[in-house]
């Protein structure tokens, strides 16, 4: 707001965002008169096709720890400096997974809301430099962080929305490179089965046969770009101009 107050009243303002969450959009609207919204591509959020997605359906959530250990051993994670970003759902879970990995002998750090800003920055820089090639994070790291050369994203616990899933796996396969994402899916996540299957099919990724046991109904959203809790914050909608990717 302070920066905006420094601009002359009749200035022409362009605002850009990779995503357009309601809070940011509402703030932007307070600065604008008769705005025009320009969308490049589709409003439907889709997964990066350069990311190879693997979904493991587990009968019991308690199997996650064993499967994580098995996967890290299979890629020889202790002997390489490949960056592996592991997502947990809650702060306490993230800390527990981090402690477990450290006990197994891995160089690991974490990012979540219980850490100070200083510690979060230090842990992020250690991950960037691969001095600690494993990072356990909550969804605080799912958006906005551009960390180069992340080889794997592991969804230890499925997120609360399919949008968060797409943003999580988007931390790999950046800058034109390919990436890999592994997701543990349990009965507790069955409400997301239909949306996850859609994302996998749209990206031409394999759908595990075990997903057949889950309901595939996709609940209607109020807005495809902004997720389940989108709410129009201003009474007048802007004009919308949409360009296809080929334009």
Predicted region positions:
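Intrinsically disordered, low-complexity, serine/threonine- and charge-rich segments
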Residues: 229, 235-238
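Conserved helicase RecA-like core
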Residues: 1-5, 9-223, 240-247
């Amino acid at each position: 707001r302070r920066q905006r107050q420094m601009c002359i009243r009749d200035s022409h303002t362009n605002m850009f965002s990779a995503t357009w969450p309601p809070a940011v959009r509402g703030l932007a609207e307070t600065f604008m008169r008769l705005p025009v919204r320009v969308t490049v591509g589709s409003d439907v959020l889709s997964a990066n096709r350069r990311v190879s997605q693997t979904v493991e359906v587990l009968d019991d959530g308690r199997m996650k720890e064993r499967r994580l250990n098995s996967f890290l051993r299979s890629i020889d994670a202790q002997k390489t400096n490949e960056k592996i970003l592991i997502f947990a759902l809650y702060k306490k879970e993230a800390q527990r997974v981090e402690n477990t990995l450290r006990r197994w002998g891995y160089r690991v750090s974490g990012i979540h809301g219980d850490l100070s800003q200083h510690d979060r920055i230090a842990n992020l820089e250690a991950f960037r430099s691969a001095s600690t090639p494993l990072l356990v994070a909550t969804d605080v790291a799912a958006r906005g962080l551009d960390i180069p050369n992340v080889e794997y994203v592991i969804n230890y616990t499925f997120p609360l929305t399919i949008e968060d899933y797409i943003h999580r796996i988007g931390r790999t396969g950046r800058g034109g490179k390919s990436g890999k994402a592994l997701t543990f899916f349990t009965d507790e996540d069955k409400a997301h089965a239909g949306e996850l299957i859609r994302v996998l099919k749209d990206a031409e990724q394999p759908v595990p046969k075990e997903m057949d046991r889950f309901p595939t109904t996709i609940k209607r959203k109020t807005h495809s770009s902004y997720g389940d809790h989108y709410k129009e914050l201003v009474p007048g909608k802007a004009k919308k101009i949409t360009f296809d990717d080929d334009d």
